[in-house]
């Protein structure tokens, strides 16, 4: 096959069929009359992207702020819709328990999100935490906030499920097909792939850590990071089953970690994310944690959970894209032909059905009610210029680590 051969001509192409791309495909496939094509450099649900690693948190009450509440509630409804459509259980409704010293910034921002969004919740003092959740190390002065609408998401299963739902509705996905470049022309977008040329009227780019390889003009706005995940073996796994142990976040002695109950029956995810490194090349940068990093994760995990064995039984590293303020980009180019979804900063998967809808609507009509002004390219470019000029914008948003 000639590299210049046109292999597909479609209305909308989605480059990257992972967290956001799979959901954009699902929403687009529900629109009548559109021909929709996904282009994915790997297979259906793989271990190379930000969504991999078994599970992610779903939080309605976000420590990143009430900016995200509308998207969270929309996403929760859409997770339920996808579950009904496919018969798959994707959201584990365990709640999400945040534990930290009273007055910790993450707790205060979570509480503000609860108040502003009127979200269901529980507050627990140290005595209640020790009684109800003895798995945790609880210090005097610790408090807990239970996000009642929160839970855990089966991330690889969710991506594969959204892909299959889109295909059943008429979308096509080209797997194992790297995209080499995108060029705008007078009559649409030309997408060069390893298998040939795709012509599309619109293209949605959701390529995570590979974003700037596909859209190099975003290099001043988007960079790549590596998110580490670790699992440990409890001495008593029955204490960590979903009926007894919620999804959680913990801040202790300056360290932050998150995790979910056991899903495999022998291990539990306890993932310290105090340190997240930037990377230059998601294809070649380190794909596993060093022994020193594993020891550091073990020290943090055993301080937080005394009932686990002091050894990582499984670990992985996942490339992700980020922005300077950790606020995502969900916007369309000046031409209206290229839609960008990038910079989710480890805080995107929970919102992916809602963000996928935003991206689909931007491709279809150029606008979306869920596109917050801070998600625009204009905002991010103003912030980049302000940083260069050492200025503070009136709409600056506090940088809080997400997952």
Model-derived regions, located:
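Helical element adjacent to the flavin cofactor pocket in flavoenzyme catalytic cores
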Residues: 146-202, 206
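Beta1/beta-strand and adjacent pyrophosphate-binding region of the FAD-binding site
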Residues: 5-20
